[in-house]
Amino acid sequence: MDLKKFIRSIPDYPKKGILFRDITTLIKDEKAFEETINQIIEKSKKFNFNKIAAIESRGFVFASAVSFALKKPFIMLRKKNKLPADTHSVDFELEYGKATIEVHKDSIDQGESVLIIDDLIATGGTAEAAAKLINLSKGSVAGFIFVINLFDLKGCDKLIKLGYEVENLINFPGH
């Protein structure tokens, strides 16, 4: 199944000059969503990991389904002040400013290997921050799996240069 056909492209969203890749059309089709999860599971076989983490919020859609199917614990990497217990935090740069992601301090035990799943990678800033958060928690990053790679924005290349293994399902230009 060509999953690319299930991604809606919306020009000038959220601002002029951006071509938004919308996953809602993928996840509303049960066969396309199932195929997406199956492809992520297949790609995950190359990684050795104890837990699965995802970045708020669209990454949760895919990672929680994979976590359930593989019977692996699921960790939420959330925006600042969204988690109720003690957290580790990492600040990072966005295209429009700064952001912070957090994880509960008790989510990852020392030495655990974490697979990070997200819906999309663009410049790689959020993914790099997620990796820093896993490392700050005394875990290690097994690798990344993205549903969509905006290849000309070079986020996957950035992660690979940092020494991480990266897989993705669909390639699109960023603009």
PLM features: what roles do these ranges have?
Residues M1-H175:
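PRPP-associated nucleotide enzymes
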